[in-house]
Amino acid sequence: MRDSIPNLVIPPHANDQGLSIGAIEYLRKEYNLMALPKEGFPFMQDDEAPPRPSTKTIKDTAELLAQGKIVGWYQGHGEIGPRALGNRSILMNPFDPQGKDWINAKVKHREPFRPFGASVLEEKVSQYFYWNGPSPYMLYVMDVLEPDRFPPITHADGTCRVNTVSPEQEDYYMLLKEYEKLTGVPVLLNTSLNNGGRPIAGRIADALELYYKTDLDTLVVGDEIKNKS
């Protein structure tokens, strides 16, 4: 479809939230109002975004991921849409053959067959997946070029749902860069910061509840790293 319709756009939030934002944007253009700023939470929340992580925190987190830790990553404002894109994510290295089963059983508490997505540096995506160009919203399924190398992110049919990360996503981009320095691979397993049947963590309190009630090894909220061991 993309070959025959090169300018095809699939909205990343085809739900009530997206309809509301679309209605606002339509009226904005109709009345020549200023563009909406990208910064900020898309709806009201009762706590502030945490401070940004320091370079040291990002490097320390990359080291934990390289060691095989399961990390909750809570940064900035929240995201809307069906996927976690680096602000409300559970992250893990993409190599561990038991990684998918472990997260499904111990953290997500959901069916064992359900696959996980991945994040990759935008400029490196074609080195690991059959894909060229951006895919920032994790809406496309891509063939994994070396499925045996990345078992926890590779579905039974050899594909993975991927979100590409650009320099605009400063902190998450830096995390992938630091992880690449340690492992040689700018790819992380990325799933939403929640467990089965629960919405993605919208507040710091939600992230802390998930951390203490599951087997997450580490939770990074802003510039603070919480470790259980």
Which sequence ranges carry the predicted segments?
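Flexible beta->alpha loop and helix N-cap segments adjacent to enzyme active/binding sites
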Residues: 1-229
